């Protein structure tokens, strides 16, 4: 069996840059998976994906020319159906074999296999392995069909009649097994061994790939194309760093921009340009956004992190004299920066406060009213949170920042660059002479914007950020706009995680239930909360709605904690109690982990689970106190005394926030708990004894589950 390395390439017109890497990896993965499912790979097969602006390709090592032959066992029917009492084939078996074209097979050649319900007849067949050409044709069809393309193009083949649907028109197809061309076809093309190099950097129109292993090297040396996405990306990164270092500056790190530029060039060339220093009077975030978003440039910073007037260009050609390219890019960026300066100067002619009435003309959501109404809601809630977390001074700062937080949405700069919302609000607030605390709170109320983002810097910013996120959540919940599956158009999961992170990482002594309750109260008091429930309106705030939102928060918290490395049992143990103060959760989790390491932990967790099951099935009255005089069995007396001895210390440790000690104290209960369940019948026929023992178990459960529900740790 001949084994060689395999190469597949689709030569296309320019592919969508933002999805190029994803397309390349998906194309390669489906080809490999399809070949593997047809036994056309080996244990030594290694996949390498290629993706450049005009090509998708995959290289696979150790691919056989034909799949190995296989013995396939085909289940026919139960023996009782296929053979009669004398062991002769029944008409049903004859009919089945005839349908398979195997009517000449002797019944004695059939294999008998005992399965769970009956003994079955199997027909073993030798199946010849599929040839690579046929298997690769199927793999190509699978890859083309499964490629994750959001929008496809429709174009006609050269015959002018047949339409083809694909992400971009395809002009070439390579399929090489070593040096041999595999005659697969797709898009009206039959595979060959020729491709094309760079559009402008090479003279020859076609490049012959003489072996699957020489694809990347030939393209790079003779075609002026670096086909590997990761290699091209590393080349660009190193070039940017070297160019910046040469002038003692630092290039802004932006992985998204780096990916996009990597998808735009085939053979990158790093050039440096500059713009007039007058533009540096504009906030550097505006200039950076202009350069990155509009022009795909990489801005350069000085050692203090301040923007300079120099920038790096990743060109797709390498001319002898780069001056024309640089001057052309400088001319374009001057126009772009002039626009940014105009926006900045024009915006400052109006105060943020003067823009507030215009927010009433901007729709927030057709069922929730305007941005002006939303702003007043957030303002009220921020003021309440400020009082809960501080004093009237903090409440006043939160009120002012919340009032102005959305005003920059109406500025020209944010209209051009929406990602600058909040940031421009800070600049304009400082320009008006506002206190730095208010200015930073305006910017920070959007934080955290994404996973791993920094949190608000001040308490005022925290108050407004919490209010803004809670408003979004409860308002959208009130109109039934909940996330479903992987769809979350309003980023409600991100908003919930933002609230969770702020409460935990800022160690805020305020309960989640309190925040949700206050948010619900404000929504109910606002005009939107008073509208009739029905199409086009928010529903009234009900206890069910509040409970639904609380469940959503704890679900997001559980997922986040598991992502941080906590086990499902640890997370369930803590969150099953629904602790309101989220800032305590890390300490509770640490205590649970320490408790689980104790030798007594497994036994106590199992006992706690048993206690829970008994109490769940029993009609116990939580108001019934333990009657010491009613304790009869020595084991229940011992348990009662042991519980009484540790109860005070456990409660004190819990109140002091020493959760590790509060749980480790429980270790003393192992022996008396084990003895109790070995020697005492809880559901005694005597009602007084039964009620007393249930009361003892309730007290035991309350003590054991103060920090966490340790029954969740049971195996």
Swiss-Prot record:
<dbReference type="InterPro" id="IPR015944">
    <property type="entry name" value="Gly-tRNA-synth_bsu"/>
</dbReference>
<dbReference type="InterPro" id="IPR008909">
    <property type="entry name" value="DALR_anticod-bd"/>
</dbReference>
<dbReference type="GO" id="GO:0005524">
    <property type="term" value="F:ATP binding"/>
</dbReference>
<keyword id="KW-0030">Aminoacyl-tRNA synthetase</keyword>
<keyword id="KW-0547">Nucleotide-binding</keyword>
<dbReference type="GO" id="GO:0006426">
    <property type="term" value="P:glycyl-tRNA aminoacylation"/>
</dbReference>
<keyword id="KW-0436">Ligase</keyword>
<dbReference type="GO" id="GO:0006420">
    <property type="term" value="P:arginyl-tRNA aminoacylation"/>
</dbReference>
<protein>
    <recommendedName>
        <fullName>Glycine--tRNA ligase beta subunit</fullName>
        <ecNumber>6.1.1.14</ecNumber>
    </recommendedName>
</protein>
<dbReference type="GO" id="GO:0004820">
    <property type="term" value="F:glycine-tRNA ligase activity"/>
</dbReference>
<keyword id="KW-0067">ATP-binding</keyword>
<keyword id="KW-0963">Cytoplasm</keyword>
<comment type="subunit">
    <text>Tetramer of two alpha and two beta subunits.</text>
</comment>
<keyword id="KW-0648">Protein biosynthesis</keyword>
<dbReference type="Pfam" id="PF02092">
    <property type="entry name" value="tRNA_synt_2f"/>
</dbReference>
<dbReference type="GO" id="GO:0005829">
    <property type="term" value="C:cytosol"/>
</dbReference>
<dbReference type="GO" id="GO:0004814">
    <property type="term" value="F:arginine-tRNA ligase activity"/>
</dbReference>
<dbReference type="InterPro" id="IPR006194">
    <property type="entry name" value="Gly-tRNA-synth_heterodimer"/>
</dbReference>
<comment type="similarity">
    <text>Belongs to the class-II aminoacyl-tRNA synthetase family.</text>
</comment>
<dbReference type="Pfam" id="PF05746">
    <property type="entry name" value="DALR_1"/>
</dbReference>
């Amino acid at each position: 069996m001949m084994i060689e390395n395999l190469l597949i390439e689709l030569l296309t017109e320019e592919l969508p840059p933002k999805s190029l890497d994803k397309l390349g990896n998906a194309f390669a993965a489906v080809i490999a998976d399809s070949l593997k499912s047809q036994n056309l790979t080996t244990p030594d097969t290694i996949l390498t994906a290629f993706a450049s602006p005009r090509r998708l390709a995959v290289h696979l090592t150790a691919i056989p020319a034909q799949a190995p032959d296989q013995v396939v066992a085909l289940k026919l029917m139960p023996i009782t159906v296929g053979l009669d009492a004398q062991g002769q084939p029944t008409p049903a078996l004859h009919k089945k074999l005839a349908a398979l074209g195997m009517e000449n097979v002797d019944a004695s050649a059939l294999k008998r296999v005992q399965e769970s319900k009956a003994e079955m007849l199997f027909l073993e067949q030798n199946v010849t392995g599929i040839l690579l050409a046929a298997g690769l044709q199927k793999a190509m069809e699978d890859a083309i069909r499964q490629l994750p393309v959001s929008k496809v193009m429709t174009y006609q083949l050269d015959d002018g009649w047949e339409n083809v649907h694909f992400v971009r028109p395809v002009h070439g197809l390579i399929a090489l097994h070593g040096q041999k061309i595999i005659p697969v076809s797709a898009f009206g093309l039959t595979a060959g061994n020729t491709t094309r190099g760079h559009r402008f950097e090479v003279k020859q129109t076609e490049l012959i790939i003489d072996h699957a292993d020489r694809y990347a090297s030939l393209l790079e040396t003779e075609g002026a194309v670096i086909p590997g996405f990761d290699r091209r990306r590393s080349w660009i990164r190193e070039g940017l760093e070297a160019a910046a270092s040469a002038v003692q500056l630092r290039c802004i790190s932006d992985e998204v921009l780096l990916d996009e530029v990597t998808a735009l060039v085939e053979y990158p060339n790093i050039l440096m340009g500059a713009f007039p220093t007058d533009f540096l009077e504009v906030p550097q975030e505006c200039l950076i956004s202009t350069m990155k978003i509009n022009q795909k440039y990489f801005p350069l910073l000085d050692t203090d992190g301040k923007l300079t007037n120099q920038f790096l260009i990743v060109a797709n050609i390498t001319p002898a004299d780069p001056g024309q390219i640089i001057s052309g890019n400088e001319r374009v960026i001057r126009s772009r920066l002039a626009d940014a300066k105009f926006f900045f100067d024009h915006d400052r002619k109006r105060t943020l406060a003067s823009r507030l009435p215009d927010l009433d003309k901007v729709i927030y959501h057709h069922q929730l009213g305007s941005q002006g109404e939303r702003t007043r809601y957030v303002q009220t809630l921020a003021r309440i949170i400020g009082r809960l977390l501080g004093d009237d001074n903090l409440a006043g700062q939160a009120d002012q920042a919340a009032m102005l937080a959305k005003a920059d949405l109406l500025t020209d700069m944010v209209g051009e660059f929406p990602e600058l919302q909040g940031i421009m609000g800070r600049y304009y607030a400082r320009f008006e002479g506002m206190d730095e605390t208010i200015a930073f709170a305006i910017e920070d109320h959007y934080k955290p914007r994404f996973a791993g983002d920094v949190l608000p810097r001040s308490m005022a910013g925290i108050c407004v950020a919490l209010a803004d996120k809670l408003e979004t959540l409860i308002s959208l919940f009130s109109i039934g706009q909940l996330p479903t599956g992987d769809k979350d158009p309003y980023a409600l999961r991100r908003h919930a995680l933002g609230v969770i992170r702020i409460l935990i990482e800022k160690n805020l002594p305020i309960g989640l239930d309190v925040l949700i309750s206050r948010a619900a109260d404000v929504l109910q008091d606002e005009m939107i909360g008073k509208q009739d429930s029905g199409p086009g309106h928010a529903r009234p705030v009900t206890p069910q709605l509040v409970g639904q939102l609380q469940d959503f928060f704890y679900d997001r918290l559980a997922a986040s904690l598991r992502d941080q490395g906590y086990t499902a049992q640890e997370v369930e143990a803590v969150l099953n109690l629904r602790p309101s103060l989220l800032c305590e959760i890390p300490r509770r989790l640490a205590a649970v982990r320490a408790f689980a390491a104790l030798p007594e932990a497994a036994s106590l967790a199992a006992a706690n689970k048993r206690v829970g099951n008994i109490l769940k099935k029993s009609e116990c009255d939580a108001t019934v106190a333990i009657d010491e005089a009613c304790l009869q069995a020595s084991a229940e007396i011992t348990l009662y005394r042991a519980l009484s001895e540790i109860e005070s210390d456990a409660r004190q440790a819990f109140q002091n926030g020493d959760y590790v000690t509060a749980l480790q104290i429980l270790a003393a209960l192992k022996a008396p708990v084990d003895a109790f369940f070995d020697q005492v019948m809880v559901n005694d026929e005597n009602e007084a004894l039964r009620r007393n023992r249930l009361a003892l178990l309730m007290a035991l459960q309350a003590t054991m589950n103060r920090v966490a529900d340790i029954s969740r740790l049971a195996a």
